[in-house]
Amino acid sequence: MDKLYAAIFGVFMGSPEDDLTDFIEIVKSVLSDEKTVTSTNNTGCWGWYWLIIIFFIVLILLLLIYLYLKVVW
C-alpha cells in the first residue's frame, strides 16, 4: 500500500491538493469495494442532453415546415 501511495504522490506532484485527495479516496474505495465515492463531474449533464434533444426537435420541425411550404406554394 505504501508503494501505491508513493506512486500516486509522484503522479500528482504538480497538480492541486484536491486532485490528489480525490484520487486517493477513489483508490481506497476501489480497493475496499465501497460505493461511497460520488462523481462531481456529472452535475449538469442532463441539462445538456435536454438542450441537444430540443435543438434537434426544433431543427426537424423547421425542416418539415419548410418542405410543407415548398409543396403548398
Curated annotation (Swiss-Prot):
Entry's induction text: Expressed in the late phase of the viral replicative cycle.
Superkingdom of source: Viruses
Main subcellular location of this protein, as a coarse class: virion
Cellular component terms per the entry's GO annotation: membrane; virion membrane
Listed transmembrane segments: 49-69
GO BP: symbiont entry into host cell
Protein location: Virion membrane
UniProt-listed InterPro entries: Poxvirus_I2
Presence of keyword Transmembrane: yes
Key words of the record: Late protein, Membrane, Transmembrane, Transmembrane helix, Viral penetration into host cytoplasm, Virion, Virus entry into host cell
Membrane topology: Single-pass membrane protein
Function of the protein: Late protein which probably plays a role in virus entry into the host cell.
Record family assignment: Belongs to the orthopoxvirus OPG078 family.
Protein name, UniProt field: Protein OPG078
Organism phylogeny: Viruses, Varidnaviria, Bamfordvirae, Nucleocytoviricota, Pokkesviricetes
